[in-house]
Amino acid sequence: MKLKKAERRQAIQKAIELNPFITDSELCEQFEVSIQTIRLDRTNLSIPELRKRIKLVAEQNYEQIRALEANEVVGDLIQVEPNISAQSLIEITEESVFTKTQIARGHVLFAQANSLCVALIHKSTVLTQESNVAFIEKVKLNDTVRAEAHVVNKTSHHYVIEVNSYVRDTIVFKGTFKMFYISEDE
């Protein structure tokens, strides 16, 4: 059963508040309307498109990073709890894929995960000491990859961080990173 325009707009606003990373296509499916209708409703509600919503969330999180400049993070940092966990998103573009197969280059997924680990640690100097990674599924042109990093262990100069990357709900990459850090007072 389709909702009336006012009810649908209210429901769209609530859906985006609950998940600011929901796509217009996903909203189309959820509310059984065309993409043009979703775009008109978003415009009427003064809700920016997905890319702008991601950038707004990312800008708020960059302030919490100490070891990297915002432009050094691969992907958009969408959540960071210093020394505990972080998440980022990256859209796979033409520059990120092999021309013939349209499959993402592995170093892009690795760079997203690795820079997320550096951004997560709230120290001035953070370096990757070792990593163990696995590429689980292929990632294609225009996919959006969500990387989630969680600290699993901390010692006097190291963090061990697990990273899982997803396209929608499918895991595409996983890795364990041992990160070396130096405190400012050292």
From Swiss-Prot:
GO terms for molecular function: DNA binding; DNA-binding transcription factor activity. Residues 98-168 form the MaoC-like domain. InterPro entries: HotDog_dom_sf, Thioestr_dom, Transcription_factor_FapR, WH-like_DNA-bd_sf. Keywords: DNA-binding, Fatty acid biosynthesis, Fatty acid metabolism, Lipid biosynthesis, Lipid metabolism, Repressor, Transcription, Transcription regulation. GO terms for biological process: fatty acid biosynthetic process; negative regulation of DNA-templated transcription; negative regulation of fatty acid biosynthetic process. Belongs to the FapR family. Transcriptional factor involved in regulation of membrane lipid biosynthesis by repressing genes involved in fatty acid and phospholipid metabolism. This is Transcription factor FapR. It comes from Staphylococcus haemolyticus (strain JCSC1435). The gene is fapR.
